[in-house]
């Protein structure tokens, strides 16, 4: 998955958008408050000649707000039969800063609840959906998985901070669970053995599986990657895992010890060209937890 430069917002460092001509556009933001907050986004784009980078604004850095942090919701039940996404045909909008803060589909259209664009469904009906993520636990202990949109319910970039509407479920050893996403959804699923640890600022750590599926602003491209940037930034454990294009060896792996193969690890904050780029109307991402 081709990715654009990171953006760092810390103290007096400004924010700038760098649109990418590659398949995926990604940025991260660090801002100074009580502690550094790590925010990372994924945004797909069709392959094209790279446009000129936008100049860094002279104004104050963009403020990335943190959503309220309620207690985690109980394990999300799996829908037993095909369930249409709420507001599936509604239009989406762009948030501020253009491509960097592209909001996409967060499920809120037509009066629907934020996060309704992501659902856990029974494995037997996965083939009824066009954008599927299957999570398989290869370890001997249960794994917690939490999925959420890149843009929070208040319209701010607050990925992987606890919030109402996130998917929160457990996968037992040897078990597979299925998450489906509506078209034009951008977000992250974090996972870890037993319980996902939190960084000192309250953000979920663990191993991140970032996804951008059926991006309607960029010709329907999809992308995904493994990222340990948050966990390694805060010195937290990095689970082993991978995300692959289903039935292929096209993967992003996180190896034991936090070493990446086509994945994001500490020191790669400014790199592009990592992860998966998929140009297909149907996407099936196969996520392995506890092995790569």
Task: Give residue ranges: language-model regions.
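Extracellular low-complexity, O-glycosylation-prone Ser/Thr/Pro/Gly-rich "stalks"
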Residues: 2-130, 194-292
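Ser/Thr- (and often Asn-) enriched beta-sheet segments in non-cytosolic proteins
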Residues: 39-41, 144, 168-170, 176-180, ...
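Asparagine-centered strand-capping/turn motif at beta-strand->loop junctions
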Residues: 123-127, 132-143
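Intrinsically disordered, low-complexity acidic/polar segments
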Residues: 144, 188-190, 235
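Beta-strand signatures of extracellular beta-sandwich domains
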Residues: 144-148, 225
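Intrinsically disordered, low-complexity Pro/Gly/Ser/Thr-rich segments with frequent PxxP/GP/PP motifs
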Residues: 159-190
């Amino acid at each position: 998955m081709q990715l654009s430069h990171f953006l760092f917002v810390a103290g007096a460092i400004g924010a700038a958008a760098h649109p990418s001509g590659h398949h995926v556009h990604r940025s991260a933001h660090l801002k100074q408050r009580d502690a550094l907050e790590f925010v990372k986004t994924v945004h797909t784009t069709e392959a094209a000649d790279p446009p000129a980078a936008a100049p860094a604004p002279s104004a104050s850095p963009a403020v990335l707000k943190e959503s309220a942090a309620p207690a985690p919701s109980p394990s999300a039940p799996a829908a037993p039969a095909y369930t249409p996404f709420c507001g599936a045909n509604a239009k989406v909008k762009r948030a501020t800063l253009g491509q960097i803060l592209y909001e996409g589909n967060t499920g809120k259209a037509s009066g629907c609840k934020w996060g309704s664009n992501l659902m856990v469904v029974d494995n037997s009906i996965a083939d009824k959906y066009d954008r599927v993520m299957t999570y398989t636990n290869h370890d001997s202990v249960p794994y917690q998985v939490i999925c959420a949109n890149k843009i929070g319910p208040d319209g701010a970039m607050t990925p992987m901070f606890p919030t109402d509407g996130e998917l929160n479920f457990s996968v037992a050893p040897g078990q597979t669970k299925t998450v489906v996403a509506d078209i034009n959804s951008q977000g992250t699923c974090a996972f870890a053995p037993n319980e996902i640890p939190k960084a000192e600022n309250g953000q979920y750590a663990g191993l991140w599986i970032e996804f951008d599926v059926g991006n309607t602003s960029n010709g329907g491209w999809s992308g995904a990657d493994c990222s340990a940037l948050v966990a390694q930034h805060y010195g937290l454990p990095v689970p082993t895992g991978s995300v692959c294009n289903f039935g292929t060896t096209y993967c992003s792996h996180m190896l034991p010890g936090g070493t990446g193969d086509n994945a994001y690890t500490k020191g790669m904050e400014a790199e592009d060209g990592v992860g998966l780029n998929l140009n297909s109307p149907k996407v099936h991402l196969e996520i392995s937890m506890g092995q790569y």
